[in-house]
């Protein structure tokens, strides 16, 4: 993916970088960053980033795309680490800079201790495997320049993993020690760095030991930071799993929700930034971790909502149960009132029927006696008529007339008696009909009473209040046949019960008293249940408000997530468009590069051919020069011989002249 980006993308990143975005997230380790004359960590890092951006911004147009990209990331990496210590001020390990090192570095025993600690640290961190350079105690006692360079670079990359060594060794080491504020930098100069294995090795050994301690402290701080994050996450999950009972706890849970979301975004941005600094463009694992974190967050919210829903369902079930019990109580109370009214009506009806039943036998007996008297009277009249007929047949007509007159009088009397008898018979029949209807109504009333008692007993048995129905039922004889000669009495209708007041009424009063006692107990229990119901309604209301607030919060979070997803999708589309443009540009550049490579290869071939020609020409000229040189040497030798001969001749001549003188 790095090959697809062009210079315009790199320049856009350079121009859009805001140093404060990075420095605001880096913790300050130095304890005295606010002292006078000592700028803070964030200020130092901001200055370094600004300088790096300015330097890269000026040279980005003249560099190739990969060089601009690497320069950008290296500048960011080199500007990231100085936030460990305050810039321009004292070191984090010493409040004052001193030119004198208090450590006994010249002591051989102390040097042995430092060498052993450095060797153990390098071995424990697998120095030889990572660098491919073997290390031993001898390398720390009598180091070569290569040993020192490997150890120094490895130790510094423990502090700044993205740093790239580009300049000369003396300048690079000295500038790095100055940047990280080595407290004893004045004891080292650049000329000593080029030959560290001599008499100045103890200074560099102390410097390497200081770097080792700094790396160990940094590892310890990062480990504690990871532990604190883990503990904080555990505490957050513990708090979120606790049930909410008050509004303050609900607000605290909402704050924990917000902190979890912020922590997810901060971790995602931090990991992406670290990956960008390390020249890695694959952010998909971090995005997957962010999605997993959001899934966990949504799962926690859904779990809370499900818990609240279950609590609401339980409270709703309790409320429905109490409401059903109240409805049953109201129904029992209404049935009790109805049965009580029916009992009063039945009692009044029984009393009225009892009074009537006491009068009807006497009236019926009187009617029977009158009927018997009338029948006897009729028999006497018929006997007299027969006698009169016999006497009439024996006496004369006068007597017959008298008899006719008497007959007329008797017939009138008979008509009068027959009319009275008819009236009496009609009244007897009407009374008989009334009595039959009354007896039927009485029997129907008894059946209704017994049915009501059976229903009442069944209802009481369902309520676990058993009652003996034999104590309340009025037994009625089966197949009752009433004739004119049968007197209607309680014994003719009822079976085994001659007095309802003495047998049934006490039992009904006893049951009524028990019902009144249970009603009073149920009223007391109902009052308590109503109090509990009011409390449960208040709790349901508060839980409902909490649920509404959480639903609103969830909807807000979902809307924000949808907005963020839309923005991300739009950014992704724009980036894809830009990537396509860059790919087309890269294809064009690749085509041009291939052409230039072919041209360069042709030029290389031409240059190689010219080189061969020049080599042959040089060889030929060398042969010619050798010949000329031989001639010159021969000429010089001959000239020397001639000069020596002339000198010897001159010397001999001079000697001869001197001798002649």
Curated annotation (Swiss-Prot):
BP term (GO), one: attachment of mitotic spindle microtubules to kinetochore
Keywords per UniProt: Cell cycle, Cell division, Centromere, Chromosome, Coiled coil, Kinetochore, Mitosis, Nucleus
Annotated Polar residues bias: 8-35
Protein localization: Nucleus; Chromosome, Centromere, Kinetochore
InterPro entries xrefs: DUF5595, Kinetochore_Ndc80, Ndc80_CH, Ndc80_sf
Major subcellular location class: nucleus
Subunit structure: Component of the NDC80 complex, which consists of NDC80, NUF2, SPC24 and SPC25.
PANTHER family, per the entry: KINETOCHORE PROTEIN NDC80, KINETOCHORE PROTEIN NDC80 HOMOLOG
Summary of the function given for this chain in its UniProt record: Acts as a component of the essential kinetochore-associated NDC80 complex, which is required for chromosome segregation and spindle checkpoint activity.
Protein name, entry field: Probable kinetochore protein NDC80
Organism: Eremothecium gossypii (strain ATCC 10895 / CBS 109.51 / FGSC 9923 / NRRL Y-1056)
């Amino acid at each position: 993916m790095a090959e697809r980006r062009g210079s315009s993308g790199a320049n856009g990143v350079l121009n859009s970088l805001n140093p404060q975005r990075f420095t605001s997230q880096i913790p300050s380790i130095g304890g005295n960053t606010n002292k006078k004359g000592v700028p803070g960590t964030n200020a130092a890092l901001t200055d370094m980033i600004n300088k790096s951006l300015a330097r890269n911004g000026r040279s980005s147009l003249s560099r190739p795309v990969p060089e601009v990209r690497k320069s950008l990331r290296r500048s960011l990496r080199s500007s990231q680490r100085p936030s460990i210590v305050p810039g321009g001020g004292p070191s984090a390990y010493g409040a004052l800079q001193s030119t004198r090192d208090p450590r006994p570095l010249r002591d051989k025993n102390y040097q042995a201790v430092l060498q052993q600690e450095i060797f153990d640290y390098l071995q424990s961190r697998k120095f030889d495997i990572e660098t491919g350079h073997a290390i031993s105690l001898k390398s720390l006692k009598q180091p070569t320049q290569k040993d020192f360079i490997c150890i120094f670079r490895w130790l510094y990359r423990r502090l700044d993993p993205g740093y790239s060594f580009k300049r000369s060794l003396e300048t690079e080491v000295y500038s790095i020690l100055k940047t990280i504020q080595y407290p004893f930098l004045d004891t080292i100069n650049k000329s000593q760095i080029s030959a560290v294995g001599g008499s100045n090795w103890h200074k560099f050994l102390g410097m390497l030991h200081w770097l080792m301690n700094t790396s160990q402290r940094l590892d310890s701080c990062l480990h504690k930071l990871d532990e604190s994050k883990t503990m904080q996450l555990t505490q957050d999950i513990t708090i979120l799993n606790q049930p909410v009972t008050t509004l303050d706890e609900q607000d605290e849970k909402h704050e924990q929700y917000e902190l979890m979301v912020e922590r997810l975004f901060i971790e995602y941005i931090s990991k992406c930034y670290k990956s960008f600094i390390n020249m890695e463009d694959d952010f998909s694992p971090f995005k997957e971790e962010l999605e997993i974190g959001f899934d966990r967050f949504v799962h926690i919210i859904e779990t809370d909502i499900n818990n609240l829903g279950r609590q609401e369902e339980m409270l709703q079930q309790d409320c429905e149960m109490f409401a059903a019990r109240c409805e049953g109580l109201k129904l029992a109370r209404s049935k009790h009132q109805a049965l009580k009214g029916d009992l009063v009506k039945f009692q009044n009806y029984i009393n009225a029927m009892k009074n009537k039943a006491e009068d009807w036998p006497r009236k019926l007996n009187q009617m029977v006696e009158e009927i018997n008297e009338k029948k006897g009277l009729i028999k006497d009249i018929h006997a007299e008529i027969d006698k009169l007929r016999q006497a009439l047949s024996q006496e004369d007509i006068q007597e017959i007339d008298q008899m006719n007159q008497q007959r007329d009088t008797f017939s009138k009397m008979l008509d009068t008696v027959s009319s009275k008898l008819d009236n009496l018979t009609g009244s007897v029949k009407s009374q008989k009909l009334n009595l039959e209807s009354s007896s039927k109504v009485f029997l129907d009333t008894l059946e209704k009473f017994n049915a009501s008692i059976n229903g009442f007993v069944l209802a009481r048995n369902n309520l676990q209040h058993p009652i003996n129905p034999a104590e309340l039922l009025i037994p009625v004889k089966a197949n009752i046949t009433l004739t004119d000669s049968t007197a209607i009495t309680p014994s003719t209708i009822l079976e085994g019960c001659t007095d309802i007041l003495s047998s049934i009424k006490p039992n009904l009063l006893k049951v009524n008293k028990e019902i009144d006692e249970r009603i009073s107990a149920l009223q007391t229990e109902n009052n308590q249940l109503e109090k509990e119901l009011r409390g449960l309604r208040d709790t349901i209301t508060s839980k409902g408000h909490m649920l509404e607030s959480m639903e609103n919060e969830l909807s807000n979070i979902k809307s924000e997530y949808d907005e963020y997803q839309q923005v991300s999708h739009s950014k992704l589309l724009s980036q894809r468009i830009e990537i396509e443009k860059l790919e087309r540009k890269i294809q064009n550049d690749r085509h041009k590069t291939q052409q230039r490579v072919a041209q360069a290869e042709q030029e290389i071939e031409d240059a190689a051919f010219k080189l061969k020609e020049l080599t042959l020409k040089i060889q030929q000229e060398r042969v010619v020069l050798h010949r000329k040189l031989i001639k010159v040497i021969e000429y010089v030798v001959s000239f020397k011989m001639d000069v020596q001969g002339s000198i010897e001749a001159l010397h001999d001549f001079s000697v001869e002249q001197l001798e002649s003188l």
